């Protein structure tokens, strides 16, 4: 395989992995640990 194809596939895999991790963090079990700054602020 040409180096450009390997690099393109590798970069695409990294982008998909980062997207998956961010979705898991936002909506999965770790989202319970996230806090909302608007809820923390009292007027």
Curated annotation (Swiss-Prot):
Q: What InterPro entries does this protein map onto?
A: PSII_PsbN (IPR003398)
User: For this UniProt entry, which segments traverse the membrane?
Assistant: 4-24
**Source species, domain of life:** Bacteria
Q: What is its main location?
A: membrane
Q: Could you tell me which Pfam families the record lists for this protein?
A: PsbN
A cellular component term from Gene Ontology for this protein is: plasma membrane-derived thylakoid membrane
Subcellular localization is given as: Cellular thylakoid membrane
The UniProt keyword set, sorted, is: Membrane, Thylakoid, Transmembrane, Transmembrane helix
Q: How does it sit in the membrane?
A: Single-pass membrane protein
Biological process (GO) annotations held by this record are: photosynthesis
Question: Briefly, what is this protein's role?
Answer: May play a role in photosystem I and II biogenesis.
Q: Which family does it belong to?
A: Belongs to the PsbN family.
Q: What name is this protein filed under?
A: Protein PsbN
Native organism is: Nostoc punctiforme (strain ATCC 29133 / PCC 73102)
């Amino acid at each position: 395989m040409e180096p450009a194809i390997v690099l393109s596939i590798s970069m695409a895999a990294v982008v998909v992995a980062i997207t998956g991790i961010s979705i898991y963090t936002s909506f999965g079990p770790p989202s319970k640990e996230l806090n909302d700054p608007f809820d923390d602020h009292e007027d």
